[in-house]
Amino acid sequence: MPALKGKFEFRKSPRTTRRSLLVALGYCLMLSTTLSSCSEAKNNTQESAASPVSVASSSTTEKQLVRIVRSKQLTPLAVLEKQGSLEKRLEPLGFKVQWTEFAAGPQQLEALNANGLDIASTAESPPVFSQAAGVPLVYLATTRPSGKSISLLVPVNSPIKTVRDLKGKKVAFQKASIGHYLLVKALEDAGLKLSDVKSVFLAPADANAAFSQNKVDAWYIWEPFGTRNEQNKIARVLADGGKLRDTGNFYSTSRQFYQAHPDVIKVFLEELEKTEIWTKAHPKEVAQLLAPVTQLDPPTLEKMHDKYDYGLVPITEKVINKQQEVADKWYSLGLIPKKVNVRDGFLTPEEYTKITPSDVLANK
């Protein structure tokens, strides 16, 4: 508070009226109160700086955001957002959920590293590329392996009949994505290498435009892009990843967020697993709920339901070893600059026990 200039002096003078004396006394009282308030505010500020208060401890404090990737697919994560159960669980902890959309897995993990996202949901490959770049991520949970919802598309009138026919052709996919990985495996099964095709790295929206304009010969992509293009008679499915995939998706976070908020992560995984179970058992209701999200009609979504395998599974040595195989594959292809020890991103069994839902742990 700025210093007050001047000096108050009371003289014993007949001119000093009772009124002027009261005015002066009133001003002094106001000054005293103001200085006292300033001093109290200063002390409170110092105390707050010395002893930070949790956002959950005061109803007047703005809630802290937990930023989670938004899913626009037929997934339990999309259902979780629509139903709002996570928000109800986290509110007493002082957290507000913000759902944020990203083009694909690699973009999510870039945001995770830049402190623009707290919880990501990706396939197996994006975390490997992030670890190769030195990102200190943490694998939180994984799902059952399911590749039927990822398809290798060709134009509806394309002469391409088999994967071997892709030799020398332009194939679009998001770099470092599940589409990239399954293309590698599909080509190997057909006796080809990735270098036998012309790779066109495009994010899903850009690849969709290029594919519909016949600027590429094939496209490896996930739902709902595949079904939309089939419905519009733009594409047909050459192959899917059903027999090629032996790892599930991963939920991940930054090491910093995990260490600061294990309670939030535990609540998230509990609500997610409940939603996984509900989604599996209610295909009709899920189709109605997610029709606006996926831009597909409910009957189509009901048919797509069987392309997914629902439920979290425990992170075990088998899961870690399978993920190491993915990392070793990318290194052998020269697509990551160094060997990655994926174990650096996994927690200890004791740490997983603290955050993993009990019914998931029971499936070990």
Give the residues covered by each predicted segment.
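N-terminal export leaders
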Residues: 18-23
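Bacterial signal peptide processing site
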Residues: 39-42
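C-terminal motif of bacterial Sec signal peptides marking the signal peptidase cleavage site
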Residues: 33-37
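N-terminal secretory signal peptides that target proteins for export/translocation
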Residues: 1-17
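Pocket-lining segment of extracytoplasmic ligand-binding domains
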Residues: 125, 199-200, 205-292
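Conserved C-terminal helix/tail region of periplasmic/extracytoplasmic solute-binding proteins
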Residues: 328-364
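Short, glycine-/small- and polar/acidic-enriched structural segments
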Residues: 46-193, 199-201, 217-221
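Secondary-structure end/capping motifs
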Residues: 260-337
